[in-house]
Amino acid sequence: MELPHLWQPASRLDVAGSLSAWFDSELGRELLVAENRLLGHILPDLFGYHALQLGQLVSANLLLGSRIRHRIVADTALQPVEGLSPLLARPDSLPLADSSVDVVVLHHLLDVSANPHAVLREASRVLLPEGHLVILGFNPWSLWGLWRFFRMPWASTPWLRQVLSPHRMSDWLTLLDFDVVGVESAFFLPPVDTALVRRRLSWLEPLGMRYWSQGGASYALLARKRVSCLTPLRLRQPLLQLLRPALLTETRSSQDSHQQRED
């Protein structure tokens, strides 16, 4: 008989709720500022008519730096945010047409999703060919990732729950016909809650940006959806063109002889 588990897996709402609450902490707000700085370098160069923020872990307009006018935020529960049109929907089942959105931003949604593959497939479905996908997630190859090995498994730190590396994201996106444009990261301080300690370690920021630019606590991955190259089917040839010439000659001869007998 199988013994019961001591730690039950948390649901997506539990993990999302704890991470959302963590973003209200001082450390969480500092990371969010760094992530918005990353988005500020990426979004202005992406154009189109419709932009979608998929998932709302923070009550902020993460599409603020985008030049696209129509901006949507979609999730199962939403807080009103100025500049974003709300769409109540599951991130893995959107009421949007295929190939209808130019830019999709996933803000730590894959870190808390019970089925990240399904979320990625849905983002791919609604994206136009040549549309762009921006993924923000916690970086396992950072000081924050190393921090996992020094914490107990029951720790409430949200980023310990599910960490997906940029390399794994790249593999998944390749299978979905995406080209990875590039990856950047931000916030090179360790995840310590004491502000005084973070200030004393502030020298790590310029050092990390210079020598370990993809080793920040949070990464932003930009990918472009490929254009499907469809081979057009040949039109069906008329039936007479498909018949052999000999058969055509025989058919015409029989028609002529029949016409002569009637005359």
Task: Walk through the language-model features, giving the residues of each.
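Conserved catalytic loop of SAM-dependent methyltransferase domains
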Residues: 180-205, 214-215
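Conserved class I S-adenosyl-L-methionine
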Residues: 132-160
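C-terminal lobe and adjacent flexible extensions of AdoMet/dcAdoMet transferase-like proteins
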Residues: 203-263
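Class I SAM-dependent methyltransferase Rossmann-like catalytic core
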Residues: 1-44
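A short glycine-rich, Lys/Arg-flanked "PGG" loop and its adjoining helix->strand segment in the class I
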Residues: 117-132
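A short acidic, Gly/Pro-enriched loop at the edge of an enzyme's catalytic core
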Residues: 92-104
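Short alpha-helix
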Residues: 160-183
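Class I SAM-dependent methyltransferase SAM/SAH-binding core
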Residues: 37, 41-94
